[in-house]
Design a protein with these regions (language model features):
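N-terminal metal-binding scaffold of metallo-dependent hydrolase/deaminase domains
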Residues: 1-50, 62-63
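Divalent metal-coordination and catalytic microenvironments
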Residues: 29, 34, 61, 72, ...
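Active-site gating loops and adjacent loop-to-helix segments of metal-dependent hydrolytic enzymes
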Residues: 79-110, 156, 161-174, 233-263, ...
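Alpha-helical scaffold segments that flank or form the walls of functional sites
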Residues: 82-150, 176-192
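Metal-coordinating catalytic core of metallo-dependent amide/deamination hydrolases
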Residues: 136, 140-269
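His/Asp/Glu-enriched, well-ordered alpha-helical/loop segment
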Residues: 256-263, 305-397, 401
Length: 445
């Protein structure tokens, strides 16, 4: 049965290029069979034959943006946001490893649907996620993602050093590999390709070289993603140096174990040397920039301008529970403010709001090799979009608020970055399917 078309009306806003935002006041997009079929002024789109039978959402006091992309977060950690500790490694030991240890099938079955509902309420339509080390709860996370309608790349954490699991050390590697293989065979490419697998050796502190090499080989064998963490914290970097003295730096550990490449997503990457950045650029590896987490755990500030100038692909990420919330608008705001703060002590280029927004939409999609499918509101792309209530964002004191017909894209974007959040999300669509809707998201056209 062919699904009913959906049309979204509002200020159409996206960022197809890094320094370029594009806006259309009182515009509309039409979504048919999961893809955007038309974009333009509301008066033109509303006269199209398919628009007559469409479900219309939004109105002149709304904004329509592409689905947001979060390329690094941890499902079982979400209940443990905002737990203060002096730095990364003590925080992991005190809060996170115990939380993940207890995240078994029953807990995941109850919690994961809430997690994916929260992503949708925040306007996120694609997320790259870690589960815990347990195979059973990873299955439940995938099942919840499938039911939610959201796009997800998920991996079961692998760790054979300082593991919180119950296996004897000499049994961890073969068991973890076999569990990961089963998860790949069940879920990689499931739900019509909406779900993908990411082999997930946690980081070099908690993985032997043997495990990392085996993980890289498994990912190559099955064509999956790889996700891990890199250069987040100074104590972490020093620990890696002590564990792997045969390598000149942290990034070389991953290079030597075969983990780098265009399907590898590396969280944080704050304290990289020039030679390490060159390795990431030359391998096509992707950085997940986690500004809220980087500040919360006192890890540092990633040099945005340096990473961008070096041509390393990157996207933004919430990194819950290191980051305290799933809202990518709050992550964008922190990304901007952290670079402003950095500029007080060192000369640097502060990214524009358009650039920040781009790296959460089209730029992130391009980094993940999905730029032709996602990231903007162009016809032909998949129908991932978010409908926002501008009355909840722009304080006008009028009811209804005046239309934003005289506002440019460069005027509106800072308002969204600094004031949008889950409370302003009226509806979220993934592949043309409503994955979240406020009761007020009715036809205002």
């Amino acid at each position: 049965m062919t699904p009913r078309p959906i049309a979204l009306r509002g200020y159409i806003l996206d960022a197809p290029a890094r320094q370029s935002a594009r806006g259309l006041a009182d515009g509309a997009i039409l979504i048919e069979n999961g893809r955007i079929s038309a974009r333009g002024p509301f008066q033109e789109i509303s006269r199209l034959p398919a628009a007559a039978g469409a479900e219309w959402l939004g109105g002149p006091h709304c904004a329509v943006v592409p689905g947001l992309i979060d390329i690094h977060a941890h499902i079982p950690q979400y209940p443990f946001v905002a737990r203060i500790e002096e730095s990364l490694l003590p925080w992991l030991k005190r809060y996170i490893f115990p939380a993940e240890r207890n995240f078994r099938a029953a807990e995941a079955r109850e919690f994961a649907p809430f997690f994916f509902d929260s992503l949708a309420r925040n306007g996120t339509t694609l997320a790259v996620l870690y589960a815990a080390i347990h195979e059973d709860s990873a299955h439940e996370c995938f099942a919840a993602a499938e039911a939610s309608g959201i796009r997800a790349i998920i991996g079961k954490v692998m760790m054979d050093r300082h593991s919180y699991g119950d296996l004897e050390p000499d049994k961890i590697l073969p068991v973890s590999l076999e569990q990961t293989r089963r998860l790949i065979e069940r879920w990689h490419g499931a739900a019509g390709g909406r779900l993908e697998y990411a082999v997930a050796p946690r980081f070099a502190v908690s993985c032997s070289a043997e495990m990392m090499r085996a993980a890289a080989g498994l990912a190559r064998e099955h064509g999956t993603w790889i996700q891990t963490h890199l250069s987040e914290n100074h104590l972490e970097i020093q620990t890696v140096r002590e564990l792997f003295p045969e390598f000149p730096d942290y990034t070389s550990v991953y290079e030597g174990c075969g983990l780098l490449g265009p399907k590898t997503i590396l969280g944080h990457c704050i304290h990289l040397s020039g030679s390490e950045r060159a390795k990431l650029r030359d391998s096509g590896s992707i950085i997940a920039h986690c500004p809220t987490s980087n500040l919360f755990l006192r890890s540092g500030i990633m040099p945005w301008d340096t990473i961008a100038n070096d041509g390393i692909p990157f996207g933004l990420a919430s990194d819950v529970a290191g980051g305290p919330e799933l809202s990518m608008w709050r992550v964008m705001r922190c990304a901007l403010e952290s670079q402003i703060a950095r500029s007080f002590t060192a000369p640097c280029r502060i990214p524009s709001p358009a650039e920040i927004f781009h790296q959460s939409t089209q730029g992130a999609a391009e980094a993940l090799g999905k730029g032709s499918q996602l990231g903007t509101l162009d016809p032909g792309k998949e129908g991932d979009a978010v409908l926002l209530d501008l009355a909840a964002i722009i304080p006008s004191g009028k009811n209804p608020p005046p239309p934003e017909s005289n506002m440019s894209a460069d005027d509106l974007l800072p308002l969204l970055i600094h004031r949008a959040g889950p409370e302003s999300t009226l509806a979220t669509l993934a592949a043309g399917r409503k994955v979240y809707a406020q009761p007020s998201a009715h036809n205002n056209s």
